[in-house]
Amino acid sequence: MEIKHLLFLVAAACLLPMLSMKKKSARDQFNKLVTDLPNVQEEIVNIHNALRRRVVPPASNMLKMSWSEEAAQNARIFSKYCDMTESNPLERRLPNTFCGENMHMTSYPVSWSSVIGVWYSESTSFKHGEWTTTDDDITTDHYTQIVWATSYLIGCAIASCRQQGSPRYLYVCHYCHEGNDPETKNEPYKTGVPCEACPSNCEDKLCTNPCIYYDEYFDCDIQVHYLGCNHSTTILFCKATCLCDTEIK
């Protein structure tokens, strides 16, 4: 028994440093992924814009994305709950707009490129203009949010937490304006020659003239047709239709 006890102590003495090194390695990797870091923000934005440039079929109205610290702060607050349940839309609202949301959870910190790649891989189940199957095992919402033409701001966060005693890492990105409109989710962008919708505001196949406002009514074109843009309803809920002329909206 004494020999077995001694062997156990030796094994434990060897194992503990290994576990400590593994925890330190995970912590170091996590610290390199936090979105307070400018290089991480740049990586996230650049990957999204690269993916948006290469959609098939090509997009005529795809906006260039930029980092939003306000959206990122909302994502940081929500990510700390370590909950994969979609957040309340009011918790991811910005002035003049609402934001969409993508989430992913891992057991070990992986690169943002890998996470965004997982979301984008849903494109294999999506065909522009066609409605995706209702099969519960198939989702394309993460992909369509990434390539939603009018989403021009992005802010993301990563949180370290534990579930049932095991480490977990929650990745959250907020996209503004929000995408995945149920009525048009099969067409996240307009097809055509890149920048066809913004010939005077084009940068490497992406439009740079977003409408900063958001229509909160789905039928604002009808509302404005009958009420005009000076009516209290359209002033509050149809700002994009009333205030943006040539901008992408």
From Swiss-Prot:
<protein>
    <recommendedName>
        <fullName>Cysteine-rich secretory protein 1</fullName>
    </recommendedName>
</protein>
<dbReference type="GO" id="GO:0060046">
    <property type="term" value="P:regulation of acrosome reaction"/>
</dbReference>
<dbReference type="GO" id="GO:0005634">
    <property type="term" value="C:nucleus"/>
</dbReference>
<dbReference type="Pfam" id="PF00188">
    <property type="entry name" value="CAP"/>
</dbReference>
<feature type="disulfide bond">
    <location>
        <begin position="229"/>
        <end position="242"/>
    </location>
</feature>
<feature type="domain" description="SCP">
    <location>
        <begin position="45"/>
        <end position="175"/>
    </location>
</feature>
<dbReference type="InterPro" id="IPR013871">
    <property type="entry name" value="Cysteine_rich_secretory"/>
</dbReference>
<dbReference type="InterPro" id="IPR035940">
    <property type="entry name" value="CAP_sf"/>
</dbReference>
<dbReference type="InterPro" id="IPR042076">
    <property type="entry name" value="Crisp-like_dom"/>
</dbReference>
<keyword id="KW-1015">Disulfide bond</keyword>
<feature type="glycosylation site" description="N-linked (GlcNAc...) asparagine">
    <location>
        <position position="230"/>
    </location>
</feature>
<dbReference type="GO" id="GO:0007339">
    <property type="term" value="P:binding of sperm to zona pellucida"/>
</dbReference>
<feature type="signal peptide">
    <location>
        <begin position="1"/>
        <end position="21"/>
    </location>
</feature>
<dbReference type="GO" id="GO:0019953">
    <property type="term" value="P:sexual reproduction"/>
</dbReference>
<dbReference type="InterPro" id="IPR034117">
    <property type="entry name" value="SCP_CRISP"/>
</dbReference>
<feature type="disulfide bond">
    <location>
        <begin position="195"/>
        <end position="202"/>
    </location>
</feature>
<dbReference type="GO" id="GO:0005246">
    <property type="term" value="F:calcium channel regulator activity"/>
</dbReference>
<dbReference type="InterPro" id="IPR003582">
    <property type="entry name" value="ShKT_dom"/>
</dbReference>
<feature type="disulfide bond">
    <location>
        <begin position="211"/>
        <end position="244"/>
    </location>
</feature>
<feature type="disulfide bond">
    <location>
        <begin position="220"/>
        <end position="238"/>
    </location>
</feature>
<dbReference type="GO" id="GO:0007342">
    <property type="term" value="P:fusion of sperm to egg plasma membrane involved in single fertilization"/>
</dbReference>
<keyword id="KW-0732">Signal</keyword>
<dbReference type="InterPro" id="IPR001283">
    <property type="entry name" value="CRISP-related"/>
</dbReference>
<dbReference type="GO" id="GO:0005615">
    <property type="term" value="C:extracellular space"/>
</dbReference>
<feature type="domain" description="ShKT">
    <location>
        <begin position="211"/>
        <end position="244"/>
    </location>
</feature>
<comment type="function">
    <text>May have a role in sperm-egg fusion and maturation.</text>
</comment>
<dbReference type="InterPro" id="IPR018244">
    <property type="entry name" value="Allrgn_V5/Tpx1_CS"/>
</dbReference>
<keyword id="KW-0325">Glycoprotein</keyword>
<feature type="disulfide bond">
    <location>
        <begin position="198"/>
        <end position="207"/>
    </location>
</feature>
<dbReference type="Pfam" id="PF08562">
    <property type="entry name" value="Crisp"/>
</dbReference>
<comment type="similarity">
    <text>Belongs to the CRISP family.</text>
</comment>
<dbReference type="InterPro" id="IPR014044">
    <property type="entry name" value="CAP_dom"/>
</dbReference>
<dbReference type="InterPro" id="IPR002413">
    <property type="entry name" value="V5_allergen-like"/>
</dbReference>
